[in-house]
Structure formats: structure tokens, C-alpha cells
């Protein structure tokens, strides 16, 4: 029997996720999620599939939808359904109506735990499906955008159950956001455009860990990088890392390409597009499709044409043309395969262990946003370091004494 494309993609991911493999051994033996129902809204592709199967192997009943209309891998969706019997509600190219319908169908499992990416699943529970909240022990949030929404809910006093901020764990944002986003964003752009990076002037909007990862990879491939920022501290970092820092409306005039990574809407406005170079490429690495003002650009364009599989060209009122990849949605998944497998191995290991912690400790938690416990963060780091063949020095007793003293000087 010939295995399907999706089955093979899942198998490939499984073979390259060694931290998950280590956790799987214990989960299969201990079944920490026995009797637990999990609703997930994540990018439905191979790495996510392995994470969902890990929870299932740990005893959970899992239902999954996509957290983005364009990010699903249909071959993986099919394999999860047919080969593994997992209820998955997703397809690449969902309409807005389908997207929200699938989130609701996932919540029909009446979850004990929700695992979200971007915050849409959490929002629905807090608005249209509040009846479910009383049975939810808590949940995890994967990404910066979703954490921002959770923090706003917490400040407003409307959060109905504890949520864990997986994004800000060290083994997530230092690796996933920087190395994962840096590589996968350029992979998506190059797949969509087949254009050369070397010699191009590229504006990177935002110099958080995602932005600096993108800028680092662009620099390594020979691009001339300009950074835009609203934070003077991050702007100084960008300058000392060797990049120019300018305002968007100024920088875009010299740019061949703009990549947004901010979590903020309208970073590239219609007015910016008017003064951009002809056929400038606009791509977004953030979660939502509003960092580039695609709706306004489309509404005010004289003509829109699909010029490549993932690229639309907009002719503006002044005759200028701009090329937008994947309707301004996150380019690494809409036009690529997402983060490297080994990066998501770390992120999903954190997710799995934090979900286990939630099951064991939910009765001690309040309606707050919590960090991933430090011992979980360190445990994942230690497993991966060992797999890399790395070794750590150990402090001796004299060094520990020195570390805890105050009276020993020069």
C-alpha cells in the first residue's frame, strides 16, 4: 500500500521532533490526559499534527481547526482524518464563514482545555460560547498576537479561566520567533516569488524577535535591510546590529520589498503604497492579515490581477503597482511550509508539558495569564541540548558560596 502525501509528511515531522519523542514515551505510559477533551486552533500542518497526536497518545480526545484560513495543509488534514481518526475541521483557502464555523465545530467537543494560536478560539468562548467556560480548566496560547489579546482580556477583567502564555517562554520566543520566523518567512517569500534576495533593499517592520530573525536572515543572504520601529530601544538595537532605521513612508520609497512582523494593523498604509517603487513586494509575517492595509488597497485599486499562484498585483489610483503575497496573510504558512520541524519540536514540547501542568494544577490557578513554569522551560532546553551533543559546566561548592555572598570583593 502506498502511503499518502499527508501520511508521509506526518512521518517526516515525527522523525525530526526528538524532544516530542522523549515526551511521547512517558505520555504513552502514564496517559496524563485520560478523560480530557482538547479543542485546538492551530495551523493544521505536519508539525501541528504530531503535537495533536501526542496529546491523543497521552489519552486526550482532540478536535482541531485551523487558526488561519490559508495555513492548512490539505494532505495532512486528510491523513489525520483517515489514517488517525482525528476530527479535523480545516482546509486551505477557507472562507471567513467556514473559518468561524470550523472553530465552533471544534468547540462542540465541550473542551476541558483549549489550545489556541492568535486568540480567535478563546474569543469565541468568551463571547458566543460562554456556556462552555464553566467546564474549561484553562488553556495555552502560542503566539504574540494571541498573548496581546489575552493580556487585554485580563486587564479588562473578562478572562474566564487561566491561560498560559507559551509564546514568552524562553525556549519558544528565543528560537521559534527568531530562528523559525527568520527562515520560514524567507522560504515563503522565495517560494511565492522566485526572486533573488541578494542586492535587494528590504524593509522589515518591527524589531521584536520575529523581526530581528527576518532581518538577520536577509542580511545573511545579501539584502540591504532597513528597519522600522515605534520603540526607541529596539530601534537602537537595530542600528547597532548594522541596520538603518527609518519611518515607513520614507523607507518604502527605496524598498524592493517590505516584510511586516509587528502584530499591529495598518503598518503599511495605502498612502505608503502610493509612494512605493513600482511592483514592490509586500509580505506579512504576523498572525493577522491587517498589517498591510490590504482591504483599503484593494478597495481603492483600479485593477487587481493574480500574477503568480500566491501573488496579486494591485494598480493604484496614481498608476503605481504593488504586489502582495497571500492576501497579506502570514507568508510562511500561506506560501510555504511554516517553521522548520526542529523549531516546532521545541514549541510543541512546551505546549504539551504546560497542558499537562494545567491538568495537574488547575485547582490552584486563578483567572489570569500565567507564564510557562520555569522548570518546564529548562527541562525542554536540557533535553534539546543533550540531543545536540552539548555539555554544561557545573558550579562547585566554592563558586556557589561566592555567588550567594556579598562581602567578597577585589
UniProtKB/Swiss-Prot annotation:
Principal localisation: cytoplasm
Gene3D superfamilies cross-referenced by the UniProt entry: Adenosylhomocysteinase-like, NAD(P)-binding Rossmann-like Domain
Nucleus listed as a keyword: no
Keywords (A to Z) from UniProt: Cytoplasm, Hydrolase, NAD, One-carbon metabolism
Chain ranges passing through the membrane: none
One GO process term, biological-process aspect: S-adenosylmethionine cycle
Functional description taken from the UniProt entry: May play a key role in the regulation of the intracellular concentration of adenosylhomocysteine.
Keyword NAD carried by entry: yes
EC category: hydrolase
Cofactor: NAD(+)
Binding site for NAD(+): 143-145, 177, 206-211, 229, 285-287, 332
Name used for this protein in its record: Adenosylhomocysteinase
Binding site for substrate: 117, 142, 172, 176
Gene Ontology molecular function: any one: adenosylhomocysteinase activity
Listed EC numbers: 3.13.2.1
Pfam families, sorted: AdoHcyase, AdoHcyase_NAD
SMART domains: AdoHcyase (SM00996), AdoHcyase_NAD (SM00997)
Places the protein is found: Cytoplasm
Organism: Thermoplasma acidophilum (strain ATCC 25905 / DSM 1728 / JCM 9062 / NBRC 15155 / AMRC-C165)
Lineage: Archaea, Methanobacteriati, Thermoplasmatota, Thermoplasmata, Thermoplasmatales
GO CC aspect terms: cytosol
Co-factor remark: Binds 1 NAD(+) per subunit.
Gene name tied to this protein: ahcY
Family label: Belongs to the adenosylhomocysteinase family.
HAMAP family in UniProt: AdoHcyase (MF_00563)
Pathway this chain belongs to: Amino-acid biosynthesis; L-homocysteine biosynthesis; L-homocysteine from S-adenosyl-L-homocysteine: step 1/1
InterPro entries for the chain: Adenosylhomocyst_ase-like_sf, Adenosylhomocysteinase-like, Ado_hCys_hydrolase_NAD-bd, NAD(P)-bd_dom_sf, S-Ado-L-homoCys_hydrolase_CS
Catalytic activity entry: S-adenosyl-L-homocysteine + H2O = L-homocysteine + adenosine
NCBIfam families in alphabetical order: ahcY, PRK05476.2-3
Amino acid at each position: 500500500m502506498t502511503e499518502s502525501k499527508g501520511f508521509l509528511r506526518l512521518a517526516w515531522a515525527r522523525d525530526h521532533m526528538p524532544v516530542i519523542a522523549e515526551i511521547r514515551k512517558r505520555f504513552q505510559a502514564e496517559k496524563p490526559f485520560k478523560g480530557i477533551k482538547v479543542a485546538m486552533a492551530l495551523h493544521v500542518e505536519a508539525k501541528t499534527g504530531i503535537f495533536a497526536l501526542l496529546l491523543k497518545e497521552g489519552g486526550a480526545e482532540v478536535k482541531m481547526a485551523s487558526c488561519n484560513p490559508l495555513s492548512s495543509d490539505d494532505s495532512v488534514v486528510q491523513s489525520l482524518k483517515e489514517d488517525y481518526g482525528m476530527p479535523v475541521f480545516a482546509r486551505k483557502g477557507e472562507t471567513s464563514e467556514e473559518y468561524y464555523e470550523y472553530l465552533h465545530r471544534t468547540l462542540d467537543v465541550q473542551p476541558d482545555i483549549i489550545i489556541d494560536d492568535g486568540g480567535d478560539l478563546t474569543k469565541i468562548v468568551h463571547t458566543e460560547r460562554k456556556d462552555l467556560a464553566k467546564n474549561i480548566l484553562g488553556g495555552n496560547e502560542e503566539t504574540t498576537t494571541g498573548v496581546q489579546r489575552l493580556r487585554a482580556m485580563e486587564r479588562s477583567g473578562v478572562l474566564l479561566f487561566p491561560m498560559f502564555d507559551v509564546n514568552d517562554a524562553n525556549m519558544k520566543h528565543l528560537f521559534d520567533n527568531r530562528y523559525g520566523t527568520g527562515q520560514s518567512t524567507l522560504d515563503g517569500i522565495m517560494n511565492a516569488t522566485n526572486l533573488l534576495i541578494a542586492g535587494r533593499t528590504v524593509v522589515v517592520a518591527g524589531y521584536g524577535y520575529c523581526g530581528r530573525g527576518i532581518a538577520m536572515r536577509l542580511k545573511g543572504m545579501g539584502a540591504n535591510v532597513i528597519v522600522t520601529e515605534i520603540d526607541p530601544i529596539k530601534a537602537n538595537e537595530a542600528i547597532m546590529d548594522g541596520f538603518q532605521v527609518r519611518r515607513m513612508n520614507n523607507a518604502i520609497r527605496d524598498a524592493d520589498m517590505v516584510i511586516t512582523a509587528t502584530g499591529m494593523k495598518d503598518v503599511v498604509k495605502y498612502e505608503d503604497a502610493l509612494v512605493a517603487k513600482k511592483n514592490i513586494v509586500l509580505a506579512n509575517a504576523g498572525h493577522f492579515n491587517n498589517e498591510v492595509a490590504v482591504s483599503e488597497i484593494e478597495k481603492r485599486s483600479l485593477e487587481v490581477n493574480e500574477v503568480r499562484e500566491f501573488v496579486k498585483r494591485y494598480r493604484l489610483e496614481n498608476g503605481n503597482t504593488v504586489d502582495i503575497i497571500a492576501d497579506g496573510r502570514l507568508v510562511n504558512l500561506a506560501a510555504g511550509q511554516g517553521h522548520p520541524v526542529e523549531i516546532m519540536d521545541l514549541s510543541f514540547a512546551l505546549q504539551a508539558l504546560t497542558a499537562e501542568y494545567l491538568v495537574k494544577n488547575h485547582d490552584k490557578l486563578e483567572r489570569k495569564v500565567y507564564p510557562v513554569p520555569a522548570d518546564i522551560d529548562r527541562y525542554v532546553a536540557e533535553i534539546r541540548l543533550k540531543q545536540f551533543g552539548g555539555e554544561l559546566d557545573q558550579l562547585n561548592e566554592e563558586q556557589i558560596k561566592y555567588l550567594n555572598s556579598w562581602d567578597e570583593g577585589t
